[in-house]
Amino acid sequence: MLLFLLRRIFDCRYKYKLFVKALVLFLTIVYNAGLVHFFFRTTSLDDSPEMNHVDYVAHVIVMPIVLSIGMINQCLNVCTLLHIRTSIFLYLKASAIADILSIVAFIPFLFRHAKLIDPSWELGMFYHAHLELPLINALISASALNIVAMTVDRYVSVCHPIKFFQNNETKPSRRRTMLIIVMIYFIALMIYFPSVFQKKLGVVTDALTNKTIYTIVRNEDVEALQVFKFYLIVRECICRWGPVLLLVILNMCVVRGLRKIDKRNWFWRQPSQNSRTETLAQRQLRSPRDDRSRISVLLFVTSATFIICNIPASVISFFVRRVSGSLFWQIFRAIANLLQVTSYLYNFYLYALCSSEYRHAFLRLFGCRSSLSPTSTGDSPTVRVSVHGKRCHQAVVLLGNENHENPVDEV
């Protein structure tokens, strides 16, 4: 039934409107379920039962549902991308794999908030204190940085096609892409390595059972260092604000480049003034032009959703010391964390919106379409762009885009 509905949406003329409406409706339901009513219901700023209730609803009830749906979407995403041979899609594959790994890394995080862990297990508590959040945030950052790398590649192919092809001729595209992906994963892990020392284990002995219990506390000595404060600023710029600014700026440049390409192609294919009939070139160009207009809107929507999902987490990182004793900041933190994990939900659908090649690969995955490669259209990830001069140079332009997620802050 789900595959039938997806196929009907793919064949719908105004499919992007249906996807946007469904996305907005789903996000509205998720955010209102167990979160918004707390903001209007509670007024105390230091009420431990209420804060525990907020934490339980956000991280034990709502977040597992979101992550479960996100895992299904990301698995479908990876399986679909495996059927696409284009080297540029390696960035999307690497991003989706990082998302799957981060969802798996979220499982101990959820167990800890559900109080399903043994606080007397030293090795387990050591992982929760030192490795849990840095690993999650590093994987989320790797996913976001892969999208940034893909966007940079797309920007060069659209705005500087000759230089793009010169680079592809001198260096193998697939090998270069794999090297960049490995470097991105390594850089993301190195960026969050100092965060390992941000928390430490506290030891408490139960007087009744004489049992040692380990607790997670903030390492105030490390956080007070000026070097560590400078590191936090650099980390936020690289992993949060940097990807946001780059995606917005580069996507705007890509949209402008696509419009220029559309105007140039339309000018060169104009019929004579005496011709009253529509030429074959016009009929072939009209559909890609409409598709590129739709892609321009989608690029704007995806950039806006990327900012909405990640800016709250960036704000909470600057007020981390106020979170533990304030109900308002606990609610804000819960909403920020949920906003970030919702990015796992919609990127699969945005890929399907932006790329007909992706849709064809998804349908071939379930045997709904023949294995023949589809003809590239205006919304396909590979579009032939004519550069008029002495000769027509052709550039491969990636038109797909998605939002990703940035690191989660938790105190």
UniProtKB/Swiss-Prot annotation:
Keyword Transmembrane on entry: yes
Q: Which residues form a coiled coil?
A: none
Subcellular location(s): the record lists:
Cell membrane
Q: What is its main location?
A: membrane
Query: Cross-referenced Pfam families, in alphabetical order?
Result: 7tm_1
- GO cellular component annotations of the record: plasma membrane
Membrane-traversing stretches? 19-39, 56-76, 88-108, 132-152, 177-197, 230-250, 300-320, 334-354
- Topology check: give the Extracellular ranges: 40-55, 109-131, 198-229, 321-333
List of glycosylated residues: 210
Q: How does it sit in the membrane?
A: Multi-pass membrane protein
Please list the residue ranges that the record places on the Cytoplasmic side of the membrane.
Answer: 1-18, 77-87, 153-176, 251-299, 355-411
What the entry lists under InterPro entries is as follows: GPCR-like (IPR053093), GPCR_Rhodpsn (IPR000276), GPCR_Rhodpsn_7TM (IPR017452)
Disulphide-bonded residues = none
Keywords tagged on the record: Cell membrane, G-protein coupled receptor, Glycoprotein, Membrane, Receptor, Transducer, Transmembrane, Transmembrane helix
Report the family membership: Belongs to the G-protein coupled receptor 1 family.
Q: What does this protein do?
A: Not known. Putative receptor.
The name this protein carries in UniProt is Probable G-protein coupled receptor AH9.1
